[in-house]
Amino acid sequence: MAKRRAAEPLTFRVPWKRLLLSDFPEEPPLWVPPSGTARPLKRQGDAGIMAEPASAPRKRRGGGDDRQELQGCSREPGEPPPGEQEEPRAAGGGDRVESAGSPQVADGVHSQQPEEFWQYNTFQYWRNPLPPLDLAALEDVSANSLTETLEDKNEGVEIDMES
């Protein structure tokens, strides 16, 4: 709102803009809703809609699969497209939840998601992997240095008390 109020004095100082604004008896609306079906402003909390969210899969302008779009952005230049790597999906896009008649397919899809998330997470995808740590070597070093540090502190305390 502040930007609109600040813009009004500027428009009234310019003569040709004053003429444009005088043609409208009222201020023109900032946004005109597109003509067509009226859409509700808020989602309805219908139990049927919440129980079957994938009965009508969402479509985008390209009409392609969402996973292919996401994976295509983060591929290496030499990698084949994801359609050649994956198993063929059922008709209907693949972002639908499978029916109760095929629990094996649904379990396979859910078990694959964390691996894909890790692989295509941009923060971790571009970072160098950490080298493997040998915890046994760390424990040996920390145990030796801890005992040496305790012995050194005790010697320092004895020297301070003598003087």
From Swiss-Prot:
It comes from the Eukaryota. The modification Phosphoserine is found at residue 102. Residues 23-113 are annotated as: Disordered. Keywords: Phosphoprotein. Disulfide bonds: none annotated. This is Uncharacterized protein C9orf40 homolog. The lineage of its organism: Eukaryota, Metazoa, Chordata, Craniata, Vertebrata.
